[in-house]
Amino acid sequence: KEIMKIYIDFDDVLCETAEYFTKIAKEMFGIDVPYRQVQFFNLQKSFDLNDEQYEALMKAGHLPENLLNYEETPGASEAINKWVDQGHEVFIITGRPFNSYEPSRQWLDEHHLERVPLFCVDKYGRETAKQDYRYNMTLAELYNMTFDFAVEDSPAAFEHVIHFDNCRTAVFDRPWNSRAELPNDRFVRCKDWQEIDRLFENREITK
């Protein structure tokens, strides 16, 4: 049986990050942007924040106690555990700051994903110091890996996934990607984890 290598993004794929940020934006700044109206992957733009506010929001959202409170996206851990049970190799690839590795790892362990490795990749060129964590990766290192199937929500990350030859990508349908043009027909919009799992199961038929 063919073993597939699977790339899974973290925020707004495994957990409801934007939902959480809408809550803290309201608490911190009285900004009321419902989740459905988060139009841009860039939250500074979506919430119309100045640089200082945006920095404060990001800091708050990445505090360990807050990271641990993110809600799991329904069906995520079931589908992923099924794939792991079938012998596939799953990697969680996040663009979160390198220093949020520990709480992110803890969140995965608490949501029955302790068997799945997590890597923090500097997807958006935000990291300044090359800290020496085992689970850090540059984009160049990511591009040296191969994947057969990916799950992503961020239009900004589509260009990363295009690097993987013949990789089918499930695009998790979110308000901020609803108008995004999908790069090619290997990208398929899915509304939930059930659809993602179905796409994965039928990948041979649709290649």
Regions found by a protein language model. Give the residues of each.
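Active-site neighborhood of HAD-like aspartate-dependent phosphohydrolases
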Residues: 2-54
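Short catalytic/ligand-binding loop motif for oxyanion handling, primarily in non-cytosolic enzymes
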Residues: 15-18, 23, 90, 99-103, ...
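Short, basic/glycine-rich phosphate-binding loops at helix/coil junctions
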Residues: 46-63, 117
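Short, acidic loop-to-helix structural element flanking the phosphoryl-transfer center
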Residues: 61-92, 97-105
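Generic beta-sheet signal
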Residues: 93, 121, 172-174
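Substrate-recognition "cap/lid" segment bordering the active-site pocket of phosphatases
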Residues: 98-151, 155-162
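Structural recognition of alpha->loop->beta junctions
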Residues: 110-122, 146, 182-205
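Acidic, Mg2+-coordinating phosphoryl-transfer loop and its flanking beta/alpha structural elements
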Residues: 149-191
